[in-house]
Amino acid sequence: MKNTIVIKLGGVASDNLTDDFFQQIIKWQAEKKKIVLVHGGGHYITKMMKALDIPVETKKGLRVTNKQALEVTKMVLIGQVQPAITTAFQKRNISVIGLNAGDTGLLEADQINDSDLGFVGKITKVKTALIEQLLAENIITVIAPLGINSAHDWLNVNADTAACEVASALNAEALYLLTDVPGVKNGAKIIDEIATDEINKLQTTDIIKGGMIPKLASAAFAAENGVGQVIITNSLENPGTKIKSKVAIR
């Protein structure tokens, strides 16, 4: 969708939205850009799980999600994180609406074939009609990373993956993956640009690890599937690291 910008907010990033962030959103809207946000909430999910004495586990950067963890994830994402984001927009008189998998089955997903991960899903389809309808009315959409399978079971979906799938489905002109670091680091230095075919090498040499592994895998998917530009950064003003299709690392 021409002139569409997708922004993924990490759990911590969503709690620290600055005036500069909102000024950039307002500027883009004045330029007739359409804005979609996909939010995470891992920090708050972990905090709630610990408070409820539910074990917190991850595997290859993904949260292990049993039935209890899934219910906590839904509660935190839809009941805490998303309302905080939409309220921040409303305070600035910016039209916004929160969406989740329960809205027209927005994100269809299949359960990942890994019994250790539990109720973790991979998106198979993004139903863009509702999103496009809202964008046509200049309403910003804020999407929780939860999917629903063919049996109408809810699944936890990695927020980076969800954002990249949404951006690809909309053929977005840009995708910003906002996180708590200013870009992908090689030691103390930020890598300006990464080619999708160089990501495996960065992983095997331990330049990327932990949660950055699925983040870069998702970014590579977006870069190779219709998204104009993909940027990993900590703010909309920071150039961060650009992920490009098969371009040498600089």
From Swiss-Prot:
Alphabetic keyword roster: Amino-acid biosynthesis, Arginine biosynthesis, ATP-binding, Cytoplasm, Kinase, Nucleotide-binding, Transferase
The organism's place on the tree of life at top rank: Bacteria
Pfam families: AA_kinase
Gene Ontology MF term list: acetylglutamate kinase activity; ATP binding
GO annotation, cellular component aspect: cytoplasm
Localization per record: Cytoplasm
Binding-site residues, substrate: 41-42, 63, 156
Keyword Isomerase: no
Site (Transition state stabilizer): 8, 215
Record flagged with keyword Transferase: yes
InterPro entries: AceGlu_kinase-like_sf, AcgluKinase_fam, ArgB, Asp/Glu/Uridylate_kinase
GO biological process: arginine biosynthetic process via ornithine; L-arginine biosynthetic process
EC number, as in UniProt: 2.7.2.8
Catalytic activity from the UniProt record: N-acetyl-L-glutamate + ATP = N-acetyl-L-glutamyl 5-phosphate + ADP
Pathway listed: Amino-acid biosynthesis; L-arginine biosynthesis; N(2)-acetyl-L-ornithine from L-glutamate: step 2/4
SUPFAM superfamilies referenced in this protein's UniProt entry, alphabetically: Carbamate kinase-like
Signal sequence, renumbered to the chain: none
Known role: Catalyzes the ATP-dependent phosphorylation of N-acetyl-L-glutamate.
NCBIfam families assigned to the protein according to its UniProt record, in alphabetical order: argB
Family: Belongs to the acetylglutamate kinase family. ArgB subfamily.
This protein's name: Acetylglutamate kinase
